[in-house]
Amino acid sequence: MRIVITGATSFVGAAAIQELLENGHEVYAVVRPSSRKLETLTGQEAGKNALREGRLHIVENDLSAPELLTEKIQGSCDAFCHFGWGGSGSGARTGEQLQEENLRASLNTVRAAKALGCRRFLFSGSQAEYGMHQTRMTEETECAPRSAYGEAKLRMRRQGEALCKELGMRYIHLRIFSAYGPGDHPWTLVESCLDAFTGNAALSLGACTQKWNFIYITDLAKAVRALLETPETAFEGIGNPVFNVAGDDTRPLKEFVEEIHRLCKGGGSCLYGDRKENAEGAVNLIPDIGKICRITGWKPETAFGEGIKKTLESR
């Protein structure tokens, strides 16, 4: 398949590209002009080989001008993965104007995907769309986002699906839960724990009593590939285009933190209750991943402890 991917150097984008290249696909990796993170794509063996073989194409283009992609990508493409989204950190999630701009650009990206001949459009939504819940979250669970970020992602789910139907494309909306692994953002909980515990430092945390779920980045990348490769007939009649993408291990967040602490040989310490919650507040993550497993055959393979060990080894 010929696949276009925005947010190509992001944590999720880079992992998805590596997975797709390793499985023989051709990728147009859309990056910001003068991006300083190209090494995330070209530094891996899969990227180096694909560049030599002409299966990896680096396309410089601003997220706000997706219409220009038709001038930079020659020929027809099969699918489009839109991982590009400005301001995903906790602080930027409350910025309504930025999130409105993200939504507008994303809808224009759908139109660009159609112009490129794509038949399938994957969008990276977020668990932040669900808001506060105390019970298991299925794709049918009512959404009540608590930030401008979650609200914009939810609006894209509705408007993006409608636009894709109008243009004759299959819309697939990934609700991604907490991903971790090599290349993760330095401000995430897992990375903060690893920094503190390997550096023998104290880490300020919330109460960490809520239920949580993590997915290792390679498993997430495989889920993206599964949703791209699954035949169209498998999606017929499902109605709701949302797919939860998460791990299969849900437990109190504190247990995950303590497991990281043990794997870091007990260095440093945890100051529970010392930190205020993020933009969405203290949410419970209890995802149901039955739908994606049933329709695509994908399932998470990496146990949390195994993923932490791999992340430590990559440092």
Describe the predicted segments one by one.
Residues 3-23:
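N-terminal Rossmann NAD(P)H-binding glycine-rich loop of SDR-like oxidoreductase domains
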Residues 5-6, 82, 120-123, 131, ...:
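Structural signature of the Rossmann-like NAD(P)-dependent dehydrogenase/reductase core
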Residues 30-35, 63:
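N-terminal Rossmann-fold cofactor-binding loop
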Residues 57-101:
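NAD(P)H-binding glycine-rich loop region in Rossmannoid oxidoreductase-like domains
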Residues 80-82, 86, 107-148:
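Conserved Rossmann-fold NAD(P)-dependent oxidoreductase catalytic core, especially the SDR/UDP-sugar
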Residues 135, 158-212, 217-228, 259-261:
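NAD(P)-dependent short-chain dehydrogenase/reductase
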Residues 152-155:
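Active-site helix of classical SDR
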Residues 200-201, 205-315:
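C-terminal substrate-binding subdomain of Rossmann-fold SDR/epimerase-dehydratase oxidoreductases
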